[in-house]
């Protein structure tokens, strides 16, 4: 393919920059900020940026590339929501879809859903770095958080992602444990909880469907409150 930014459609490249940053740079935002500051102060006559991962950047896109890294390194997110969930029998997935529909109906355009058993972890992390609201749903498995969800939570923890909104939901058959074990993640990460955690026993009832929709609306309202 092409080598220079001016010769290609960059829409895919911006998404890849998010994905690379989330997976590789992640927690080192303070160091990125220091480098960006030094670079600006040096005022070097740069003609090309030859990145090891991505195209050769020309001055036409310098500001966009620097602005994106500046925002990511400050954990500044776009308006949007990431619903990540695990499901064993499909019940948690139904609730995930319901919450996502409530968010969209509340006026939020960017709503992404990830079944953690199938979505690549790199794509999930990319979207968490990109969007402000994170909604985590898990069934209870052997009195614990579903393992794929637990793994993603650990990846988020290692990257020290800051300044996000968190909502929690889940399902169980015998004894509900997953939801109550996810809730403390908000305090651990310094995130703001939005809405009351939702938990269903087995399949979704009409009442819980309504509550899922309402939670989605609350998330949308919290996101819209940040508009200026």
Name every feature range the model reports, one short phrase each.
Residues 1-2, 61-64, 180:
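Short aromatic-enriched loop/helix-cap "lid" or pocket-rim segments at secondary-structure transitions
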Residues 79-125:
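Long, well-ordered mid-to-C-terminal structural blocks that present hydrophobic/aromatic surfaces
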Residues 3-50, 54-56, 98-112, 124-228:
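FMN-binding flavodoxin-like domain, especially the glycine-rich phosphate-binding loop
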Residues 61-68, 94-95, 114-123, 144-152:
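A general structural motif
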Residues 48-81:
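Terminal amphipathic helices with adjacent charged low-complexity linkers/tails
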